[in-house]
Structure formats: C-alpha cells, structure tokens
Amino acid sequence: MADPNSSAARSALKRIESSLISVLLAFGVSYAALSQTTEATGAPTEIKKVSRPMVWEAGPEGNQVPLWPEGLAIQRPESDKPEEVGNGSRLVAGRPWTWASYVSHPTMTIYPPKGQNTRAAVLVLPGGGYAAVAMDLEGTEICDWITQKGMTCILLKYRVPQAWRHGKDHVEEAPKAQLPLQDAQRAMGLLRHRASSYGIDPHKIGVIGFSAGGHLAAAASNAEKRTYEPVDAADRESSRPDFAILLYPGHLWDERSPERALELSPWVEISAHAPPTLLIHAMNDPTDDVRHSMAYGMALHDAGVPVDMRFYAKGGHAFGLRPTSAPITTEWPELVVKWLQNVGVR
C-alpha cells in the first residue's frame, strides 16, 4: 500500500482535487447559464462566477517549476488571500474559461514541442487585467497550438493582483514595482540559462501576450535592465525576448490624449533594442482601444524597431484561440506562423 504522505500520493490527491474543482466549476456553469442568453440563439453568454481556494497546477503534460529559489523572500501581491481558481462570467465562443488569482508563488510550466523540434520557444503571458491570470483561454490552449508547431511553450503564472490605481484627475498610474514584469524577466533568464536542458535555442525565445499580458510583453521587450536585484546565475542572462507578439494589449496608449493623437502612457518605455514585434487587434475592442496597439506600433517604428500591425474591423476582446464569427479569431494563428517565418524564427 502506498504511503499517503509520500510526494506521489500528495501529487495524486492534488490531481483528484483539481478534477473535483473542475466538476464543481462545470456544475456552476451549467446551473447558472440559463439566465444570460442571446436573443438570436438562446445560447448562454454569461454564467455565474464560481471560485475555490486552490493552487492552479499544470496537467501531466507540463513541467511546472517555481520561478524563484526556495526560501527567497519576494514581494507578495496586494492581498494575503490564498491562491484561488475560478471561472470568468463571460463565455468565450460558448465556453467558460478559468483564471487563477492571489498568486504569491509564481511558476512557469514548460510544454515540449510535438513532432520535429524547431528549437524555438515562446513564453505565454495570459491576460486578466493584472487582477487574475487567464490560465486556459490565453494559456494552456495557446500552448497546445504552439507545441503543435514544433516549438517549446512556456506558460507563466505571474503574481497577481496588482492594481493600476487612478490618481489625480482619475488618471491611471502604474505600480512602482511591477511584480508581473519581475516574473517575466526572471522566466526569460531561466529559459536562457537552462536552454540546453529544455532543448531550445537561447537566441530564439520570444513572448506572446494577451491584453494585460500584451502590456507585459511590451514592458519586457523594452526594459534596458532587470527590475529586481539579481539572485543567481540565471539573472546574468538577457531578460529581453527575441521576438514579441501582442494581441489586444492595454496599458500602452495615453487615454487622456485626443482621440486622433497616438501618445503613449508616461510609464511606457521604448527602446531601439526592442525585438521584432507583431501587433494584432480588433477595431471594435470594447476593453482595450485599438489605439493601444497603434500608439505602441508607431513608437516602435519611430525607434527603428521592425514592427508589423494587423487590424480587423471586428473581433472584440479576449478571444484567445477560440473561433467566433469574426475572421480575426480564425486567421490570427496563421498570421503568426507566417510572421515567425519572415523574422527567421521558424
């Protein structure tokens, strides 16, 4: 009989717990979905939020590792609550999505490529408004696609929540210490430091970010130095990605500027050393105005950074890889593949 206190037994119990929570979430979804429906089809568009205190863990196909050395005191997010996992209230392509929040122990999960290994790697930065991390919609589902293209995928679960407050005249203000950026920079250093063991080329490690994760990708692309004190040899590696893909990013455009102006927010740094960048955005995005991508793209161009921008009339916000009636949701993955070929990554 297996020892119930062994690491294997504890791991098995956590998998069972995760499965039970998924069932509970699904039950909550099915029960609540009757109230919010579209008039045209009767299909649900919103569901009741259900959350439970638990730590998000990757499935058996991923190798989940801590970002920071054990015992190192790192800054906690803006809450003492234990980590939670729950579902968003808005269905995406008729399906629920899962988030993690109150993350104080950030991790990265490595998913190996399927088929021939191109030795390229992509660090996935999900969105969630810096309040949560969209772990499946803009995380594991993205990694499923990336690994099918022969690339290693790394999913970052970064520290949240961290509020972007509104100060004088209700103007948004960036946090002084951006914890998600620290986690992203740490992950890039670890990936380069461990490149040979992960089977990746240390010069072909990029990022793909969604919504708030798009801003995080931009911040990592332009930071000239680390935003924390180095802790080990991994922090001697470059923390700048080799390429960057941003989908419907926010926190970039200065919304105080006239609508015709494309001025960046004061906290956005632009470096001539930023990597080749691809921006994808829908013009009717109700959450993060398309001007976030426009302003950032033009600033990169003015700095001499290679940048491509693809805008669609419709598509909304936070669709991930889930297909809807909007062409952007089905066409952007192939755009990314062709762009990666053009910049010499694949």
Model-found features: residue ranges?
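Primarily recognizes the serine-hydrolase "nucleophile elbow" in alpha/beta-hydrolase
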Residues: Q182-P266, A272
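Conserved alpha/beta-hydrolase "acid-adjacent" motif
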Residues: T287-H292
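N-terminal cap/lid segment of alpha/beta-hydrolase-fold proteins
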Residues: E46-G115
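Short beta-strand element of the alpha/beta-hydrolase
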Residues: R119-G127
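C-terminal catalytic histidine-bearing segment of alpha/beta-hydrolase fold enzymes
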Residues: M294-G297, H301-R346
